[in-house]
Amino acid sequence: LIAKYNLTEKDLIAQQKNAISKTKYHIKTKTIYTIIYFLLIYLYLFITHTPGDSIWFGITVSIIFSPLLSIIYRHGMINRFRKDVLRHHQHLTGDFSLVLSDDELVKESKNSTERFNWSEFNQIKEDNDRYYLYITDLKAVTIKKEPENMNEKETKEFQALINRKKNSG
């Protein structure tokens, strides 16, 4: 099967959002930031010799605001991705051709060709419009679910192949 599609900045940001919420790396990093946040609150309360009631108030406030850390982390990572990766690596967007077989996946653009065996992907995730084939927690191949060059029957065959690989791995 040969699929042709265009990846935009929106597609890569969607992949980054998926990675932030589903990969071990980002989950561990968010956990570490949360622990550091609590330690800093407790350290501040200890250094300022805050009375007991204020310590409980500080703990309560830190627990209430801890969900904001996840939102701040996600927003920060997306902004960093926009500034660093998308600005300096414009070859990640544009027109791509994808050759799929039972053994491998070949991703081609005007600048490069990448070959992957299906066994190289440790996770295959998806959203409504895309598949994310993770090689590592930080490197993924983003594929549109509906290629531009395929009719409905070919698209279903294309999706069935990826879903078979997703369910077998």
Range-by-range predicted roles:
Residues 72-115:
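Conserved beta-hairpin
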Residues 130-169:
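A membrane-cytosol interface segment of integral membrane proteins
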Residues 1-3, 114-116, 141:
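Short beta-strand segments
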